[in-house]
Amino acid sequence: MKNQNQKYVFPISIKPGQTYFSDANHKPFLWLGDTCWRLFWEYTLEEAQTYLENRAKQGFSVIQVQLLPQYFHQCNRRGHKPFLVEGNLHSVNPIYFDEVEKVLQYGKKLGLSFAIAPIWLSSWEQDWYQYFHGQTVLDYSAFVAQRYCHLDNIIAWIHGGDDDALSLHSTIHQSANIYKQINPDIAATYHAGISGGWEFFGDQNWFDFGMAYSYDKDDCFKQFQDFKSRYPDKPILLGESHYEGNEGISTDILRHYAYSSLILGNCGHTYGHKDIWIGTMFWAQSLCSAASHHMEVAKDIWDQLDWSKMQPDFKGRWLQTLRSKMPHASSKPIPTCININRNELVAYISDFRWFRSTQPVHKGKWIDPISGREKQLNWLEEDTLQIPGYNATGHTDWLLYLELKEVNK
């Protein structure tokens, strides 16, 4: 399988007024991310290269990583710690950061971008938050921004990390401004607790795009709706959610979040596998997991769409549920987007409800998110639709593509 990412030209950035990323030639860039948070210290260079080669071949375009080990006393696989004195952010160990660059440079050769969390601020799983104060952390911020400013495949800085970190907001703001001053073209966001970081920093000049974070389908929908109502001219994507390999998490759950993000955010999505982000002994076997293949299918489908022109529908304007009081049916909103200029509609439907398009349909098709295979529309009545049964894994989720005769704007 060939590397699917070479068509993009670095650097990748957000142009003014765009709700998506684009490359140096202004080509829309689909953020298809993978969380390998511990890549820089749990993986050897050779293992990291194997991982990156696989993700590039599968069509992933962004790797989300943490720059520092989980705890200040940890080292990377070559025995190097990021700081020569534990907990002293002034005592940077250049060898550690040089080895990070080797991974970043290898990813660049493969056409991969990196979204990097410079210092993870979770107070319940890491201890770096204890040192996030004063001039020391601002000097560290300047060091990191300058150390990697020559790399044009860093797509974003992820500030925060699994925590609202309310007591640290003043320092977070100062730190983020330093990154923006030194790296003005690298986008920035905030990774909060189970919510959206825009609630705290969305109005700041350094905040460029939203990173939703949710483990609940209804909440995920509401996060996208909230962000788009506040910041209609900024991108948003689901940056973290359920992980493949976690107990009770089936692939249809992962697909629901993926397509919700792609459809409602108009920007991209980030997938993750438990054994890969943690770096367990099973990480290599997990590279070819079922859901990672489904993400590859999603990319192939989206590459055929003029997706950057799609607009999400949060009000149920384009698809109307007709009947849901029946087994395995729902009346909840259908993730839907529409390209008004091309009269195209895309939706993700995962139950047996009856529904209709509010606009006259010229033609359409169902797309199996497992295989990418297509099926003809199955009309129950003159204008009534229902999913065509079970997909290739025996689940009930499908993509609907419609070409409309006209769109009543």
Predicted features and spans:
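Structured core elements
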Residues: 64, 80-81, 237-238, 270, ...
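A generic structural motif
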Residues: 35-36, 373, 381
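Active-site mouth of glycoside hydrolases
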Residues: 2-221
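Hydrophobic anchor at the start of a short beta-strand
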Residues: 114, 236, 364
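Short strand-edge motifs at loop-to-beta-strand transitions and within beta-strands
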Residues: 383-385
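Residue-level preference for short coil/turn positions at secondary-structure junctions
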Residues: 17, 59, 150, 184, ...
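Aromatic- and carboxylate-lined catalytic core of secreted/periplasmic carbohydrate-active enzymes
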Residues: 244-245, 254-378, 387-409
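Extracellular glycoside hydrolase catalytic/binding regions
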Residues: 146, 160-293
